[in-house]
Amino acid sequence: MTSADPNRQKLTQLRKLLIQHFSLDELRVLCFDLGLEYEELPGDTRTTKMHGLIEYLQRRGELPRLLNEAVDHRPNVAWPSFSDGSAAMQKDAPAGTPKSFIHEKTGLEMLLIPAGEFLYGEEKELKFLPNFWIAKTPVTNAHYAKFVVDIGYKPPVTWWENGKYPPKLANHPVVSVSWYDVVAYAQWAGLQLPTEQQWEKAARGQDGREYPWGNEWRPYCNTLEAGIGATTPVGYYSPFGDSPYGCVDMSGNVCEWTYSWVDEKEKFCVLRGGSFFENQEQSRVTYRGDDGPNYRFDFVGFRVTAYFSIFDF
C-alpha cells in the first residue's frame, strides 16, 4: 500500500483550518492582504473560493505567504508547516532578476529579499519566506507628500505646515502617521506593509543576529544613546548600520508600523525597529513594540513591501 502524501495531507488540513477560522468577510480581507482579487477566485461559496485560493498559491510556490497571513490573523491555531525544502516552496528568483528597482509611483528603491529560511524571534525559530521586495528606507516626507497631494489626504500634524513639510526634512522619515494612515498609503501605492516576519528577515538576514550589523551593540544608528533627540535623514548611518540585504535604519531613527497585530483580538499593531526616543535594547531586531492603530507619534514611521510575483522583469 502506498503511503499517504504528507503534503496532500497538509493541504487538506490547511483548507479545513481556513474554513473553520475565517468567515467570508475575513476571506475577503485575506485576499486583499495577499494582493489578490476575491471576485476572481473560482467558485461561488466560501469553501470553493478557499480551495481556489490554496490551489492558486500552491501553483506559484507561494503557500508560505498564505500561511504567514493566517498566522498573523490567528496566531493560536496549529497551522501546518510547508517549509520542508520542497522545490515548490524554495523558488529562486528567475535568472536576471535585479537586486533592486525604483518603484515608479512612489520613487522608493525596493530591495529583493530572496526566498529561504531564516531564524525568527527571540527563540530563533526556523521560518521560511518566499521572495519579496522591501523598501530600502522608511517612507520619507517627500515620498509621503506625493500621496497627500495626489488624493488630498490629510498631512501629518507634526512638523508639516499648511499641508507641506519643511524642505530640510524632505529626506527624513515621515512621522505622526497612524497605522490606518500608512495602510492607506500602501493601498494608494499598490504596495503593502511588511508582516513581522518580513520585517525581521529584512533586518537581520538568515543568521539570527541581534542588530542589522551583527550581535554586538555599535553606535551605528539613531537611538537614545546618540543624543540627537530627533529623526535623521534616512541612511545617515549607512553603510555601517545597514542590514545584510542593504536596508537602512532598521534599528533606530523611527519605529516602524507592521501589518501584524499583537494577537487575534486585533486591538494593537506591532511596531519594530526602535527609534531615536528608545535605547539600544529596544532597537534590537527582535524587540516588539505595539500601539493602537489610531495613535500617531513623532517617533513612529513605516516602510513598505511588494509581493515578488506582481513584478515581471
Each language-model region and where it sits:
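Short, structured beta-strand segments at or near domain termini in extracellular proteins/domains
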Residues: 298-312
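Feature responds to low-complexity, polar/acidic, surface-exposed segments characteristic
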Residues: 7, 42, 155-169
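Acidic glycine-/aspartate-rich tracts in secreted/extracellular proteins
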Residues: 139, 152, 206, 260-263, ...
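Basic helix-extension-helix modules of the SAP/HeH family
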Residues: 2-87
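Short, P/G- and charge-enriched loop/turn segments at secondary-structure junctions
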Residues: 97-101, 122-124, 288-293
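Functional-site microenvironments in short loops/helix caps that host divalent-cation chemistry
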Residues: 119, 161-289, 293-298
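A short glycine-rich, aromatic-capped structural motif
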Residues: 102-159, 175-180, 252
